[in-house]
Amino acid sequence: MLKEIKTKTKERMLKTIQSFYNDIKGIRTGRASASLLDGIVVNIYGGHQKLNQVAGVSVTDNKTLLIKVWDIGVIGEVKNAILNANLNLNPVVEGNTIRIVLPDLTQETRERLVKLLHQFAENARVAIRNIRRDIMEEIERMQENKKISEDDFHNAKKEIQNITDDNIKKIDGELSIKEKDILNY
């Protein structure tokens, strides 16, 4: 039973970590990255399509993204979706491709991005701690109902705390790497 709780804890915390990674993937560093455009949705064909479903995105150099739209009839909608994504990007249409030259990040922009990054990290840490709290309450109920022994209770609390600490270290490590990318590139 405790093994199931431990597994459930790891799974829930892993989902939180993956969500954090997805959040920070869209934060721009000084380098061009195709993942910068992952969250963009294009309104075409009477519905919504992710950009990577209607075009291929490649990096040509450190500052340039090249978007090859597969259906030239929707290139205007793709350009508008990029403009409306509030990423401070200026797409230029060249035939059936769109070129985006990323502007240099100002110090003010870098600081704003780092602040946003810290906000994502803190939200992830809070989510991890909330998962820990829920699991600890579940373990305490089991101990009160005599479903587990006192020793198992204390061992489980220790293991859950270790899992929590490991996941918070992952968040802090990724935060540090991304922060250095933003500030130093």
From Swiss-Prot:
Gene Ontology biological-process entries: translational termination
Annotated compartments: Cytoplasm
The keyword Protein biosynthesis is assigned to this record: yes
Keywords associated with the record: Cytoplasm, Protein biosynthesis
GO MF term set: ribosomal large subunit binding
CDD domains found in the cross-reference section: RRF
GO CC terms of this entry: cytoplasm
NCBIfam families referenced in this protein's UniProt entry, alphabetically: frr
PANTHER family for the chain: MITOCHONDRIAL RIBOSOME RECYCLING FACTOR PSEUDO 1 (PTHR20982:SF3), RIBOSOME RECYCLING FACTOR (PTHR20982)
Function summary: Responsible for the release of ribosomes from messenger RNA at the termination of protein biosynthesis. May increase the efficiency of translation by recycling ribosomes from one round of translation to another.
Protein family per UniProt: Belongs to the RRF family.
Name of the featured protein: Ribosome-recycling factor
Lineage of producing organism: Bacteria, Pseudomonadati, Pseudomonadota, Alphaproteobacteria, Rickettsiales
Encoding gene per record: frr
